[in-house]
Regions:
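Alpha-helical transmembrane segments
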Residues: 9-13, 70, 92, 116, ...
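N-terminal secretory signal peptides
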Residues: 71, 79-155
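Short, well-ordered alpha-helical packing segments
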Residues: 121, 130, 161, 165, ...
Length: 506
């Protein structure tokens, strides 16, 4: 293969990604979804339910964007190679990529024709970059065809490399600009720092911790709190621009802004959240000090009409969930949260406002970046995850896990401390028992329950001889219901079964 031919493959890829970098910079600056992210969102929203559910449970979101970029590498390389002899291929090929990206952008939430401008500019950057690279490559190609090498060939190669460096520079600067200079991202960070919310700092209640090394902290730091959402690029919403619309089966529509919300009577509570995708013994769970405003008074203010049994919540990015109305109105601390652990909500956890409803899995309750609530009935709605086979109501199930020792650990024979956590929000845990090597169940010591809406820690000391051992845990809730041993998958409404760990005493 001639050396200039290889250069065309490379030039096609470099020009293509220069256009993507320019698109990225513009969309970050204007707080719009980029073309690649829009395509990823489109693929997610239009994939079969089985694929979406697999992706949710297997970190599929992490590979979608890289997979799209890999496909683009191949497409751009082919465009570059074909453009060597047929320049119109570059115009048409990059144009086709732009059309697909633009079509995906127009399907994003709140899209207008104006969102096509960054796509168009990115397309021009692609064609322009390949034109510059192609001109230099054409000169090299002419020498290749004539079998002319030596100093003339080396000089033209230097010219080509200078242009490559310039195009790389444009791509790199565009990428950095998108990362660093995103207007609303910077403004949001400044806004969060300047907020003076009427909230208190968290104080961990006395007696809730069992003080065993290896048991996860009773209060989960915000940067360690689990993250599960469908967003490939999380929305950037400013408090000054935020509003919530409450409508549907109500006597009067209500629209409140951020200042209205924080001026209302506040509520603060320790609440444990866990994901419906959490496997038995999994770590998709956390406990935090949430501050906000109760949701029930707002709905009463709107005037709930007879027959309503659901609230369709919508996020700024268009994600939806259907929430049972009863669980909002029954007196639990269902809130519009504005702070987490005494600080404004982090962007990843829904800044400026998200919903928190104790006792329900997040897929039917925990809407981050919430902007709309429609009071309605379940037979009139089809929310994001229920469309994909998940249950309609989503009540949290009783669960427990062994955290100390971990599976595969080696411990000293004799007295061995076993410890972990248990939870069933809005009901509460009354007892936790463990079983060693299939023997009788024995009780454990519980940490104090801060409320029925938080997890509890537990511990026990057992006497073990040298050898391999298995410890199993089960919990009993405040109503006397014992955790089932029956293993069930997370789909459609949460996993069940006892958690066990295998370890060795030496």
């Amino acid at each position: 293969m001639k050396r200039s031919a290889v250069g065309w493959w490379f030039a096609g890829v470099l020009a293509g990604f220069t256009g993507l970098a320019v698109n990225y910079a513009l969309t970050e600056w204007f707080n719009q979804p980029g073309a690649v992210i829009a395509v990823a969102d489109f693929v997610r929203d239009h994939s079969p339910a089985g694929i979406v559910n697999w992706a949710r449970e297997n970190s599929g979101k992490k590979i979608t964007v890289p997979a799209i970029l890999l496909i683009l590498v191949l497409v751009f390389a082919l465009i570059g190679r074909l453009a060597r002899d047929r320049w119109w291929v570059a115009v048409a090929g990059y144009g086709a990529v732009g059309v697909l990206g633009g079509a995906a952008v127009l399907t994003t939430n709140g899209a207008t024709v104006a969102r096509l401008v960054p796509v168009a500019v990115g397309y021009v950057a692609m064609v322009g970059a390949l034109s510059l690279l192609g001109e230099r490559l054409g000169r090299l190609q002419a020498l290749d065809d004539q079998q002319v090498f030596g100093e003339l060939w080396r000089g033209r190669r230097r010219d080509f490399l200078v242009v490559v460096g310039a195009v790389f520079g444009v791509a790199g600067i565009s990428g950095i600009a998108g990362r660093v200079l995103g207007g609303d991202v910077r403004k949001q960070k400044e806004e969060q720092k300047s907020l003076r919310l009427p909230v208190t700092a968290p104080v961990v209640p006395s007696g809730v911790r069992v003080d065993v090394d290896g048991v996860q902290p009773w209060m989960t730091p915000a940067d360690e709190f689990y993250l599960i959402d469908t967003a490939f690029s999380r929305p950037v919403v400013l408090a000054e621009d935020w509003s919530l619309r409450i409508h549907g089966m109500v006597d009067r529509e209500i629209v409140i802004d951020y200042n209205d919300l924080i001026a209302r009577d506040g509520v603060e509570a320790w609440i444990t959240l866990n994901c419906v995708s959490n496997e038995v013994g999994g770590d998709l769970i956390g406990n935090a000090w949430w501050s906000g405003t109760l949701l029930a008074p707002l709905l009463r203010e709107a005037g709930i009409q007879d027959g309503a049994d659901a609230v369709l919540q919508t996020s700024d990015d268009g994600w939806t969930c259907g929430t049972p109305l009863t669980e909002i109105m029954d007196g639990r601390q269902a809130m519009l949260a504005v702070a987490m652990n005494g600080e404004p909500l982090p962007r990843d956890h829904g800044y400026p406002v998200r919903t928190i409803i104790p006792g329900l899995y997040g897929y039917v309750s925990g809407t981050k970046w919430v902007v709309d609530m429609e009071v309605t009935t379940f037979d009139q709605i089809d929310a994001y995850w229920t469309q994909r086979g998940w249950g309609e109501l989503g009540p949290v199930k009783i669960a427990s896990k062994v955290e100390v020792p971990s599976s595969g650990d080696e411990v000293s024979a004799g007295e061995v401390v076993v410890a972990g956590t248990a939870w069933i929000q809005h009901t509460g845990i009354s007892a936790v028992d463990i079983q060693v090597d299939g023997g009788p169940w024995t009780s454990t010591d519980l940490g104090r329950a801060a409320s029925t809406d938080t997890w509890v820690q537990w511990k026990a000391t057992v006497e073990l001889e040298a050898g391999d051992h298995t410890v199993t845990v089960r919990a009993t809730d405040a109503q006397g219901n014992v955790q089932t041993s029956v293993r069930a998958d997370v789909l459609p409404d949460g996993a069940t079964g006892w958690h066990s760990v295998d370890f060795t005493a030496t």
